[in-house]
């Protein structure tokens, strides 16, 4: 008896992935937008179509395309076979019945300001957040800080207010905020977590654009959490990105820096363009010209602070 040969899909060893896409500068053509929407699941098309503002729709679209690109290229799952779901907290995840060679495979996305960003790891728990430094929409910076007083510890406020100029204070505010959000997204608890339970000891205070640093330490309820590592970077002059990393079993891992590890690492963000996003894409639905017509009538305004995919 002759048995048919089995087909094996070889998956190369996967390393951590860090991608960013400038949705703020992306002005999609009709062809690009219609191709993009044909390349995502119908329920996500419906969700994106409900956004009132173009910039929100573009950021959400970029996030979905980055996730599908990640799964297609790193897990070797054909684009049109990828099934994404959402947890009860709304976090995008790969469907449990998907063929995945990495049981602990984890990814997370964030979009705010001018960028959508993605972090993925084959073995580590991961959370990511991006924040753009910008002046408050209403009131002065001191008034804004007063409103947000309960979000940070006294020590964190000392660090934030330790700089003379208000713009640098805002920089430090959003850097701290990105760190806290990255942790909360990594553990998947969503709203309701008391942010003052978290305290970050920032190091170094100044970050160079394009470098990645891992010296910042986390204290939870006053105790240092040594099993967590935090990658910090600046994509450009105004955007901070924080990536929280932890082994699923909570043990210390190699990405946690030693006490004398003061040099930046080289796991930098790769800036993708639209052609990169759809390089592996397979259209899954018929073309829908009305989706472009609706998009053209939306206004282009900044994403609201805190908007996440």
Curated annotation (Swiss-Prot):
Residues given in the record as CoA binding sites: 47, 86-91, 108-111, 181-185
EC number: 2.7.8.7
Residues modified to Phosphoserine: 258
One Gene Ontology term of the molecular function aspect: holo-[acyl-carrier-protein] synthase activity
Localisation per UniProt entry: Cytoplasm, Cytosol
GO CC terms, sorted: cytosol
Chief place of localization: cytoplasm
Catalysed conversion reaction: apo-[ACP] + CoA = holo-[ACP] + adenosine 3',5'-bisphosphate + H(+); apo-[ACP] + acetyl-CoA = acetyl-[ACP] + adenosine 3',5'-bisphosphate + H(+)
Known function: Catalyzes the post-translational modification of target proteins by phosphopantetheine. Can transfer the 4'-phosphopantetheine moiety from coenzyme A, regardless of whether the CoA is presented in the free thiol form or as an acetyl thioester, to a serine residue of a broad range of acceptors including the acyl carrier domain of FASN.
Similarity comment: family membership: Belongs to the P-Pant transferase superfamily. AcpS family.
Subunit structure: Monomer.
UniProt protein name: L-aminoadipate-semialdehyde dehydrogenase-phosphopantetheinyl transferase
Species this protein is from: Pongo abelii (Sumatran orangutan)
Annotated gene: AASDHPPT
């Amino acid at each position: 008896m002759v048995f048919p040969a089995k087909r094996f899909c070889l998956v190369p060893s996967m390393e951590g992935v860090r991608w960013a896409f400038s949705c703020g500068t992306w002005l999609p053509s009709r062809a690009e937008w219609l191709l993009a929407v044909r390349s995502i699941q119908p329920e996500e098309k419906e969700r994106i179509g409900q956004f009132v503002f173009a910039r929100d729709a573009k950021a959400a679209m970029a996030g979905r395309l980055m996730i599908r690109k990640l799964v297609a290229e790193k897990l070797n799952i054909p684009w049109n076979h990828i099934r994404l779901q959402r947890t009860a907290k709304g976090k995008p995840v790969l469907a449990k019945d998907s063929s995945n060679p990495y049981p602990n495979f984890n990814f997370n996305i964030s979009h705010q300001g001018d960028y959508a960003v993605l972090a993925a790891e084959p073995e580590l728990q991961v959370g990511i957040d991006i924040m753009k430094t910008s002046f408050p929409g209403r009131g002065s910076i001191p008034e804004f800080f007063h409103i947000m007083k309960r979000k940070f510890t006294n020590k964190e406020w000392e660090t934030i207010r330790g700089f003379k100029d208000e713009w640098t204070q805002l920089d430090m505010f959003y850097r701290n905020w990105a760190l806290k959000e990255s942790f909360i997204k990594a553990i998947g608890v969503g709203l309701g977590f008391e942010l003052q339970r978290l305290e970050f000891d920032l190091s170094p205070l100044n970050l160079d654009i394009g470098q990645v640093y891992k010296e910042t330490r986390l204290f939870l309820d006053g105790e240092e959490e040594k099993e967590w590592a935090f990658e910090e970077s600046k994509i450009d002059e105004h955007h901070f990105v924080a990536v929280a990393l932890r082994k699923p079993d909570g043990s210390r891992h190699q990405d946690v820096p030693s006490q004398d590890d003061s040099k930046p690492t080289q796991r930098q963000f790769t800036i993708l363009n639209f052609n990169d996003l759809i390089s592996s894409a397979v259209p899954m639905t018929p073309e829908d010209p009305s989706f472009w017509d609706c998009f053209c009538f939306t206004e282009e305004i900044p994403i609201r602070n805190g908007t996440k995919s």
